[in-house]
Amino acid sequence: MSPKTETKASVGFKAGVKDYRLTYYTPEYQTKDTDILAAFRVTPQPGVPPEEAGAAVAAESSTGTWTTVWTDGLTSLDRYKGRCYDIEPVPGEETQFIAYVAYPLDLFEEGSVTNLFTSIVGNVFGFKALRALRLEDLRIPPSYSKTFQGPPHGIQVERDKLNKYGRPLLGCTIKPKLGLSAKNYGRAVYECLRGGLDFTKDDENVNSQPFMRWRDRFVFCAEAINKAQAETGEIKGHYLNATAGTCEEMIKRAVFARELGVPIVMHDYLTGGFTANTSLAHYCRDNGLLLHIHRAMHAVIDRQRNHGMHFRVLAKALRMSGGDHIHAGTVVGKLEGERDVTLGFVDLLRDDFIEKDRSRGIYFTQDWVSMPGVMPVASGGIHVWHMPALTEIFGDDSVLQFGGGTLGHPWGNAPGAVANRVALEACVQARNEGRDLAREGNEVIREACKWSPELAAACEIWKEIKFEFDVIDRL
């Protein structure tokens, strides 16, 4: 035997490669209340047994590597390893299965979504033995979630700050998203807020470009907010996008927003990164700023049914990292989102305790204990005819955000805002009177048109607009 391959049997170490399932597939394991649990949709390469593929996922996302190593004997693998504890078939898919993996809590740094994701999804998704892999859900135990601050303020504190109750909030993304000067941008903000909206918004890619530097935009938007508040008597806000190329620059922009006295800032949490997002969330809580979160880049990660991560996982990660709002699809607009799936992760964002419900894609019971909730934002291709459905689907604790559905009004920005506010108030009143918005919604809107010419004009311009494409991500 060559010295390079000699086995040191005398010290209990046997070199070589062995099947993952011999160590990491443990169907007899009883999960602990402190374990982080994961549900993976696994598509193995032909010839790879489900037990081996599931064990490989557990190994490569925890303590394992491709071969036995001498240093395994210097720690307790039984204490620290991930375990594939259950495998179930995927109905209608002969080549796929769900692998359930339990991770001991000590594998993860406290209060770090960055470390959590680096471990669970950082390397294993490129594993050759797998044709595809998707993380469908995570169970975050209270013993781990309590190490996070979570949202800077949460739903109830936001309502108290705004003094607005009993209805969804209304927003608008300023369009065109790129190319306006700071002064013209501020003008559009003022007109929309004066017309009745609660918020206006920077689009996700509005940062600090040559045509509109961030400081100029912040100043003109703050002026627009103050003017609209003075005229309407309502508290208004504009999501000032603080996303930047460095964390230091991001915080500098948030500091300037606070100095201007605005109520809310914004961050692109996936392109900006979880470390940056958590830092900004901590600053916002310490300084009384609300934090709006855009999910730009999410579809790169979550849209494919067989590979990547489901948005419910990204939503849970955001709740821990911190944000008071997050975009969550519309069900009825131009962006992807099936109703039951969307409402499943909306509950994961807002509620304290969510029961396991596979009919809505929720694989685990989730207890957030005292962590504040996040308000879902419905945005993307919506207009006044969608208002009854949006009110019925998302309920009061949501933001309904109309960009083109405000600024595309034939009479201008302020009438577009008026149309949306009238439509919302009509839907809320009808719901409170016991009317069924799902069945009577169009009639509610038509009745409101009789005393709102702005709404009537909006209804006429968008009466034929629909986005009727089949969704990709079904249960």
From Swiss-Prot:
Modification(s) after translation: The disulfide bond which can form in the large chain dimeric partners within the hexadecamer appears to be associated with oxidative stress and protein turnover.
Propeptide: 1-2
EC number: 4.1.1.39
Modified residues (N6-carboxylysine): K201
Top-level enzyme category: lyase
Active site: K175, H294
Protein name in the entry: Ribulose bisphosphate carboxylase large chain
Originating organism: Pinus pinea
Gene symbol of the encoding locus: rbcL
